Amino acid sequence: MTSIAGPHKRLEGKVAIITGGASGIGACTAELFHENGAKVVIADIQDDLGQALATKLGGKACYIHCDVSKEDDVINLVDTTVAKYGRLDIMFNNAGIIEGQGLPVSVVESEKSDLDRLLSVNLGGAFLGAKHATRVMVQQRKGCILFTSSLCTSIAGLSGHAYAASKSGVCGLAKNLTPELGKYGIRVNCISPYGLVTGISNISEANRELVEAMLSELGTLSGQTLRADGIAKAALFLASDEAYYVSGINMVVDGGYSVVNPRLADAIYSKL
């Protein structure tokens, strides 16, 4: 039986790009990947945060400015990474934006400009990241491409329409890439989180604990609150060799929320 590497060796020798890596899920993942031995390239448009994180992590990390909606930026990101480290093993397409505070909005009140903006970043950025990572990984005959999607791809009514459309597209893209890239030993997977508070949520620090408590109360897994580290740990597993035969999945990290419809049970209990 093949031995499993120790907890700090799971990505030893690997090179990872994390888009949206300067804050939130991306920053947490960058730290965890670094702790587990990877050379980490933090890609973002938040230059001060990204550079500060790279400096904190030290010599095996660097920051590259990248607007994922611009193909030239993504080409530069991948080419600079390969020039610096000689390879690319993990492409985590995590960068994303939301409408307002991410709450559902009537389609009548939705703006086409919001749809264009979210599709350009959330779906277009994922497409470009996968495209240019594949250029390198095909030559290596191995690699891992990850995407951050959303629980709104599994349950309707949790977000604005533009966001749901963009993230559903990400899941479709990942699924469609799986058979093509599998021929080259490249694994492709999505991660779809339940609600959590990150920088893109536009929620003030004063309201952060209140919103986290509400999400925890509404969740199915009692006593637990999903935070960025929960998604980072899912990404670590999928990026590691432990997941060598895992490809084409949408890993839903929601504490079981999406498999439960409490309305019938609530109606029954209310009558008892």
From Swiss-Prot:
SUPFAM superfamilies: NAD(P)-binding Rossmann-fold domains. The keyword Disulfide bond does not apply. NAD(+) binds at residues 17-41. It holds the Pfam family adh_short_C2. Has no tropinone reductase activity. This is Tropinone reductase-like 1. The active site is at Y163. GO terms for molecular function: oxidoreductase activity. Keywords: Oxidoreductase. InterPro entries: NAD(P)-bd_dom_sf, SDR_fam. The lineage of its organism: Eukaryota, Viridiplantae, Streptophyta, Embryophyta, Tracheophyta. Gene3D superfamilies: NAD(P)-binding Rossmann-like Domain (3.40.50.720). It comes from Erythroxylum coca. Substrate binds at S150. PANTHER family: 3-OXOACYL-(ACYL-CARRIER-PROTEIN) REDUCTASE (AFU_ORTHOLOGUE AFUA_6G11210), ALCOHOL DEHYDROGENASE. Belongs to the short-chain dehydrogenases/reductases (SDR) family. Its EC number is 1.1.1.-.
